[in-house]
Amino acid sequence: MASAARSASRAFLRSTPTTSSFRPAVRAARFALPAQGFRAAGRRGYASEANSGKSSSNVFLWAGLAVAGGAGAYLYLNGSDSVTSKTFVPGKEDYQKVYDAIARRLADETDYDDGSYGPVLVRLAWHASGTYDKETGTGGSNGATMRFAPESDHGANAGLKIARDFLEPIKAQFPWISYSDLWTLAGACAIQELGGPTIPWRPGRQDKDVAACTPDGRLPDASKDQRHIRDIFYRMGFNDQEIVALIGAHALGRAHPDRSGYDGPWDFSPTVFTNEFFRLLVDEKWQNRKWNGPAQFTDKTTKTLMMLPADLALIKDKEFKKHVERYARDSDAFFKDFSDAFVKLLELGVPFTSKAEDRYVFKTSE
């Protein structure tokens, strides 16, 4: 049902002229949350006096905790001060429960832009991953260092506290998942729940401390041209086709003057993942917007949409433009290429122990 509804939405959008004021309803599906399969509980052990045996046990306890922290293992002290090991190794079903919890929260919480937090979750996953530098091996989704200043204060990350806070109840419900895995899983979930392509995903990211924060300037600057775009994306290891596909995420959401300085949505359906961004980029006439903000463009037909200087650079550059035109004509090609590029983005710099063929494919909500 969900896939049929998404297909119908995309088909309707393809037949809707650019002057349409169509705004699709947000997914309102409801489903029961699966019961959590375990409880992470810590009981502090107290002893009236120390002896060599207890000291040795404590050494092993803390060593065990240090090793187990990234693997979902929990150690407990029982009433007799002995150590009991309970190991929890999450599998696909456990991550599906996390996915379902995010999807339900997206359906329930509709008090954000255009009725969905989905677009800002995609932006969080994108910005957490897009700091990767292939030469130094630093940055990327492994670490979730946007939890800390100065990275959380970088201009490109303005407004993403909303997305991070949105996911805190999910983190509390599933404390075993790292923030790094949670943020990227949330991005994959949002893409699928908003009608986009399947995003295969795998766990394995570990959170890092503030020392791993990346320097400012690694994310794309919307005011720049194609040379800047290539500099940013080539640094991560993407080619021109992948660059255009990833920028297609602008099909979702809108810009905010109090964050990026820009204003407005890119298309008429900012909570449905489509190829409309490319269709409008090619078919619509774009003119400079006259306002007090930074330079941006507005559509000549309705004057309600916007494009960024970096967006227009995609059709000014011959190599970029051929991919824009292909995606404008072929939604299926865009969906496939976006999925491949987004999976690559989410995995940059992650020291996985699993293989690519072990990625999970999550069921969408009904």
From Swiss-Prot:
A Gene Ontology cellular-component term: mitochondrial matrix
Domain of life, per UniProt, equals Eukaryota
Q: Which Pfam families match?
A: peroxidase (PF00141)
Targeting signal (transit peptide) range: 1-46
Task: Spell out the InterPro entries in the cross-references.
Answer: Ccp1-like, Haem_peroxidase, Haem_peroxidase_sf, Peroxidase_I, Peroxidases_AS, Peroxidases_heam-ligand_BS
User: What SUPFAM superfamilies does the database record attribute to this sequence?
Assistant: Heme-dependent peroxidases (SSF48113)
Q: Which cofactor does it need?
A: heme b
Catalyzed reactions per annotation:
2 Fe(II)-[cytochrome c] + H2O2 + 2 H(+) = 2 Fe(III)-[cytochrome c] + 2 H2O
Where do the annotations place heme b binding? H250
Tell me the cofactor note.
Binds 1 heme b (iron(II)-protoporphyrin IX) group per subunit.
Asked if the Swiss-Prot or TrEMBL record annotates the protein with the keyword Metal-binding, the reply is yes
Its keywords, alphabetically, are: Heme, Iron, Metal-binding, Mitochondrion, Oxidoreductase, Peroxidase, Transit peptide
Q: Which residues catalyse the reaction?
A: H127 (proton acceptor), W266 (tryptophan radical intermediate)
An example of a GO molecular function for this protein is: metal ion binding
Q: What is its EC number?
A: 1.11.1.5
Q: Where in the cell is it found?
A: Mitochondrion matrix; Mitochondrion intermembrane space
Gene Ontology terms describing biological process: cellular response to oxidative stress; hydrogen peroxide catabolic process; response to reactive oxygen species
PANTHER family the record matches: CYTOCHROME C PEROXIDASE, MITOCHONDRIAL (PTHR31356:SF58), THYLAKOID LUMENAL 29 KDA PROTEIN, CHLOROPLASTIC-RELATED (PTHR31356)
Q: Which family does the similarity line name?
A: Belongs to the peroxidase family. Cytochrome c peroxidase subfamily.
Q: What is this protein called?
A: Cytochrome c peroxidase, mitochondrial
Query: Organism, per UniProt?
Result: Aspergillus fumigatus (strain ATCC MYA-4609 / CBS 101355 / FGSC A1100 / Af293) (Neosartorya fumigata)
